[in-house]
């Protein structure tokens, strides 16, 4: 709506950069009505360019008749995040006995973000979302928890259970940290409080890698050359498929696919056992990201002349 209002008010052209085009949003339990999808495609068709952050979205746009003259893949903007808060990060790591390059990060996530657990949001509990979360929370975290156990028992690495959003400290404690065996828990740190992007990135870049059920922390890791494994599901839209688009299929797992799930723990352990090889894989993906950033931003630049 805002894009349409702006275009009508100014008469200026517009473009769209790095989006996912879902038929059902990650915050919704039902597909978008057809008229909403049609309107979205109409707005995109009026753009001078549309860059999608995953190839699945690009295919959806074409299927629904989007006619923008330039429709291509371009990586999520978060790959370029360079915020840092080294002072806070180092203080946190020192206080918790975490040494640079000697720990992995793990991020939990429920199927739907339970905003109703954040007092400041003043959100009413969504019974449908809550039921879905409860039904699948063990299913969605069992492999991460086992990955933590195997990393601690098979390597010298420690593990930091940390959040990407304000609901995940509690999820991490319940689903990952508390159930761990005593011998493993001794080498696992649970972060009890939220952090801002700068501190989080400064911790990520000091880790040997990250794994979990989130998307943007892995993006920021790869953007800084740090290995990252992504576990996804249908409720998260198609954004996770960007991992395939940048050459990281081996680090993308669909939790709705029981066969794929079998590879999660081995991938986590491999990352911990051979961090040098993992960094080479991350660097190759980052090279793809940089190439597409250069090419797509060049087109944006031409559109602004």
Regions found by a protein language model. Give the residues of each.
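Active-site anion-handling motifs in enzyme catalytic cores
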Residues: 1-305
């Amino acid at each position: 709506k805002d894009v349409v209002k702006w275009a009508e008010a100014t008469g200026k052209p517009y473009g769209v950069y790095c989006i996912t085009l879902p038929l059902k949003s990650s915050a919704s339990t039902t597909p978008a009505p057809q008229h909403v999808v049609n309107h979205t495609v109409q707005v995109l068709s009026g753009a001078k360019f549309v860059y999608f952050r995953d190839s699945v979205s690009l295919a959806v746009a074409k299927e629904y008749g989007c006619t923008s003259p330039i429709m291509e893949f371009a990586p999520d903007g978060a790959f370029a995040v360079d915020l840092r808060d080294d002072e806070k990060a180092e203080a946190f790591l020192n206080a918790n006995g975490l040494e640079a390059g000697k720990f992995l990060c793990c991020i939990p996530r429920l199927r739907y973000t339970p905003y109703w657990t954040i007092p400041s949001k003043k959100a009413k509990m969504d019974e449908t979302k809550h039921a879905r979360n409860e039904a699948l929370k063990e299913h969605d975290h069992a492999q991460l928890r086992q990955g933590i156990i195997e990393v601690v028992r098979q390597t010298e690495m420690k593990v930091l259970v940390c959040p990407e959003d304000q609901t995940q400290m509690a999820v991490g404690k319940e689903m990952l940290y508390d159930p761990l065996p005593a011998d493993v828990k001794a080498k696992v740190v649970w972060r009890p409080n939220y952090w801002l992007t700068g501190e989080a990135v400064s911790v990520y870049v000091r880790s040997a890698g990250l794994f979990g059920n989130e998307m943007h922390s892995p993006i920021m890791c790869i953007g800084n050359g740090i290995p990252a494994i992504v576990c996804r599901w249908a409720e998260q839209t198609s954004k996770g498929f960007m991992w395939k688009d940048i050459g990281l299929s081996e680090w993308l797992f669909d939790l709705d696919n029981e066969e794929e799930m079998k590879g999660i723990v081995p991938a986590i352990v491999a990352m911990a056992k051979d961090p040098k090889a993992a960094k080479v894989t991350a660097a190759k993906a980052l090279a793809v990201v940089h190439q597409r950033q250069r090419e797509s931003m060049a087109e944006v630049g031409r559109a602004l002349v």
